[in-house]
Amino acid sequence: MIDLTQIKYNLIPTFEEFDNSIEDINLNYTFNIGKRLSTSKEWNNANSNMLSIDTNDIYNILKKKYDNNDIRVISGSNCLEVQNCHFLADKDYIVREPNYEYAKRELAWYKSQSLYVDDIPGFTPKIWKEVSSTCNDIGKINSNYGWCIFSNENGNQYRKCLDALIKDNSTRQAVMFYNRPSMHVDSVKDGMHDFMCTYQVQCFLNECFYLGDAKRERFFILRYIVYQRSQDLVFGYDNDILWHNYVAYKLCKDFTAKTGYKAYPSYIECNVGSAHIYERHFKFLNK
């Protein structure tokens, strides 16, 4: 058990604040809650496993590579790349501020579980059209993350992760599998070009307590760890982090509803095989 007795009461958001932010997806607000939990001196001391590299560090690494002309050609395109990249997602962007209007539309599409890009509310971005199938089942993709974790077809990954945490809050089996062994074939079916980037998410609950109003109260802090083979640090990260924060909040809300114990998310932790930006976004490193 992590002893957070000395943490000031106001470091922990009220559950009403927390609950209201789930559907709002206002990352400035969301990350303020996360900051109270993850970057407080007391929390870092209590949880020594927190990553020390954050989004500013990743930006500085990319900037140094850009200044040194350390450019790689990946699939015919000039890129700046950081391989085997591990960092704390303490901000909702790394290189360029997010398009919140689109991020909300993509979140709605994920929640619909549709595997067709034309079902994205509003207009369908060019990048989704380019990777979707071009014959037979036209417009189909693999990477609807809502389908990946909420659908029966992919094994109800979210429910199994939540059930594992409820059954044993110290479990190491609370995992959501996004990818599948057939992806090498599925990614190019019917002219598609969609080899899913995320392959799994693992969740841990850290049991904590604090003293408030002369009583000891037990609660949990969720560690939500993402594993990806590849991530575009502009189009990918900016939208992915909104999605993962939504899922982390939903996990905490559902865990609390089922157990009666309050749970709060900390920052998302990212592990990426290839974290990169393309040449069209190099200009954002000149600021």
Name each region found by the language model.
Residues 2-287:
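Terminal, non-catalytic protein-protein interaction segments that mediate quaternary/complex assembly
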